[in-house]
Each structure stands twice: as C-alpha cells, then as structure tokens.
C-alpha cells in the first residue's frame, strides 16, 4: 500500500482518505479471481525461473521477454481498464517501495504484477 501512495501527488489533506480508499480497493481486488490468479502465476513463474525451468535465461531478464509486463498490464486492466494501463507504465518505470525491492531482488514477474495491482487500485481510487 505504501508503494501505491509513494506516487500520490494530491493534497496532504486528502492523503488519509486516499490511503483508506486504496486499502479498501486492494482488499476487494485480492478476492477477484482474475487478479489473484495472475498474482499466483507471477509467483509460480518466478519460482520456475529461479529453478532454471523457463525457456530463457531468467537471471538476465532479457529485453525480448515481455510476458512479465503482460501480467502487470493484465492485472491493471482487470481492475480499472485503460487508465490503469497508462498508470502501470508509471509504476513500472518509477518502481516505488516494494516494487523496487522485488525488482532488485530479481523477481522478474512479481514486481510487474504488484505494479499492475497498485496501478489498477490507485486508478480506481480516483474514479
């Protein structure tokens, strides 16, 4: 949740309300079977990558492999549609909080999945 708020640029007076709304939306979306299944897929793919069971060098995170972004985009789109897809690119590029931590620890899929989750939920906050 903190990573979602790291990129919040609204007024400080609204910050607590936005954070509470984000929490509510996050909890709701985690029970969405499409979102939760994509999050599970990201975790499983990271596990398979670490075990060298994917058809590319997982540790290099090669440019020609973009399925990790596809997972993040799918999560964002499921939650809040087109606006969340644009917001995903912002979270993916800035990598605030846990997203950056996951990226630095080599979680090729989960960092993008969480970026999609937060981008979608933050987009939903402002509907």
UniProtKB/Swiss-Prot annotation:
Annotated source species: Methanocaldococcus jannaschii (strain ATCC 43067 / DSM 2661 / JAL-1 / JCM 10045 / NBRC 100440) (Methanococcus jannaschii)
GO biological process: lipid metabolic process
Protein name, per record: Uncharacterized protein MJ1330
Domain of life of the organism encoding this protein: Archaea
Pfam families the UniProt entry points to: PgpA (PF04608)
MF-aspect GO terms: phosphatidylglycerophosphatase activity
Lineage: Archaea, Methanobacteriati, Methanobacteriota, Methanomada group, Methanococci
